[in-house]
Amino acid sequence: MTPSRTPSPWMLPVICTAAFLVIAQAFMMAPLIPRLAQVFHTNVGWVGLAVPAYLLPYGIATLVWGPLSDRFGRKPVIFGSLVLFIALTAATASATSVAALVAWRFATGIGASGVVPISLTLIGDVVPFQKRGRALGWLFGSIAGGTAAGATVGALVEPLVGWQGLFLAVSAFTAILGVAAVLMRAVPSLPRSAAPPLAAVVRGYASLLSLARGRRTYAYVAINAVVQSGVYTWLALYLRQRFGLGEVGIGLALLGYGIPGLLFGPTIGRLADRHGRSWIIPAGVALTGVCALLLAAPLPLVAVQAAIVALSLGYDLTQPLLAGIVTDLPGNRGQATAVMAFLLFTGFGLGSLLFQLALTWGFVTALILFGAGALVAAGVAVSMFRDERPHQTVPMLTPAA
């Protein structure tokens, strides 16, 4: 797909800010779990379901938004999803029970799921692969920053404005961003693809999964998401139980997550563009595993905070680079990105659920299980991604025998 005009210099700042707000709102729930359990007079297990209730439908709905963006264009889908996100985020503040909260989170997950993945597809449309790493570094740095800011702001600001005020504020800020994006014409209008029949859409997904390069990349998108989300979602409860921290202490402890992505995301992307992804991806998965194991150890709070920062860096070394590979797969880019977003966000949701199940044996056991699994995956990744050299994609495009 070729752009009809040169993209606005505001395109990347706008879509990165939108991604920041969408993800901040998603992970704003994590530190609020203990507080909302008190508000709704229930246990943390029930309130904790609000996290996967958002992430799982988010991931599933991306399979629909991708083909829709191919048919109707990236710009209408991004703005349409943004409007749904604004409305449903505001509506979440009306919840008076945990059941209503979970229901609103479910609906918001569906509505919001067109913003980030279609923005990623848009980058793939207008930025050549040789320069895509830096742009994706900014986007995923914004996602990591949103994860950190959501958790931190949720913990620090909730005592001041209430949990309802948090959702209303995110909705208002996103509405302002949407109006500014329209006025600045930040999102380019690209030529629409011919609308494929349903059978062609199904064949497109099957074709992507027939590629060895596609299968291994998608597998590590899912693995990375499960480990990162599983550990991160429950850090607020971990910090409360282990160190007795309140909302402010939890917010400050989580503040470091996302900082590496904001500071080093574009630099990591440039390294990938220049030197390839063959060693960076396994290193990121390994770092994630090491951080999970460190959190299981009896470390002081300052060391735990350092491990949380390093956990974020593990994400920054993996997901943006995996996304770069996905946007280079042959075939329909909207569908390729939709599969990645589906696995990424369903992985986030499943990671939260699986870690919650592992918590029946305690935090130490759960962290060891997740950390050991990540280290095994890192070892396998060394051989799986050995051919991801800079700008050499042709040998990887043939289906596996």
Language-model features, listed with the residues they occupy:
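Conserved MFS/SLC helix-loop-helix module at the cytosolic interface between two early adjacent transmembrane helices
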Residues: I60-T96
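Cytoplasmic helix-loop-helix junction between adjacent transmembrane helices
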Residues: W104-G145
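Helix-loop-helix hairpin linking two adjacent transmembrane segments in secondary transporters
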Residues: W138-R185
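Helix-breaking motifs and short loop linkers at transmembrane-helix boundaries and internal kinks
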Residues: H41, G73, S94-A100, G111, ...
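Helix-to-loop junctions at the C-terminal end of transmembrane segments
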Residues: T62-G73, F264-G276, L359
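Juxtamembrane intracellular "pre-TM" segments in multi-pass secondary transporters
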Residues: T2-R5, A186-Y218
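Paired small-residue
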Residues: L84, L88, A99-A107, V302-A310
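C-terminal transmembrane helical hairpin of 12-TM major facilitator-type secondary transporters
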Residues: S278-L322
